[in-house]
Amino acid sequence: MSQFNAESLKYHLPFHSRDDIISMDTNTFVEVIYLRRSSSETRKKILTACVRLFLEQGYKNTSVSQIVDEAGVARGSYLNLFPTKDKILLDLTETMFDGQFGVARSIADSKLPSVYAYAVDTALQLTLTELNENLREIYIEAYTAPDTAEYIYVHTTAELKEIFGGNFPDYTDSDFYEMDIGTAGLMRSYMARKCDIHFPLERKISRFLTAELRVYKVPEEEQAKVLAFIQTLDIKAIATEVMYKLFAMLEMKYDFKLSRDGETEEAK
């Protein structure tokens, strides 16, 4: 019986204990490696298909049957890896929100207080959902589904504490986490309400930021300055650029090609 370096292999085979690895013969080890690689390839196919379909036709309109047909995998394999669509949405949400605040920081002058970057970030999210209905649906679902909402709360808590901690000197991470549950709910509600002639984007952004900044005890004078700064930006043009950069990032990660008119084609 061939023996293997269990200490090094256990990190690559987390679903096996050290003792299991030590006792493996060559054939068993090869089979485990094959199954793991096969599972990884199946997962990638499913994620690629899902992201394409979500962006092309919307989250709710994408069925399990469409996903498995697009991915070319068995329904059982799909359900084994992703019992619900929400599990796939979590992977997509992590990709979309990763580095999102960094984009806002690059737009806001680094010499300005970080509350300006926060305002830009939230204004961009609201604007993105007005530019693309499928993105609106993805964002709303992300703020609604328990796993993705939890990711957003945790992901945002540290930023909130860094930005607004001075206004709440006795608040812990838990306090900011609990506040974010409320403000994230506010964000979801504003995203869900589509803009129209009676409620234009500029008013939506202004109303939302005023409510948010009051929650975090930003002085009225500072609020006015932040809102004035946002009004100087061509937020639709910036959001459009951000949207296409987001699409490009998703194309690269999930290995597909999304055309600018919303149609997708397989990456060659």
Question: Which residues does each predicted region cover?
Answer:
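Amphipathic alpha-helical packing segments from all-alpha helical-bundle domains
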Residues: 141-195, 199-213
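Helix-turn-helix
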Residues: 45, 53-87, 91
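C-terminal peripheral helix-coil segments that are non-catalytic and often amphipathic
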Residues: 6, 10-31, 162, 166, ...
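Short, hydrophobic secondary-structure boundary micro-motifs
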Residues: 136-141, 221-225
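Hydrophobic/aromatic residues within well-ordered alpha-helical segments
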Residues: 85, 92, 96, 100, ...
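Hydrophobic alpha-helical connector segments
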Residues: 91, 102-137, 144-145, 153-157
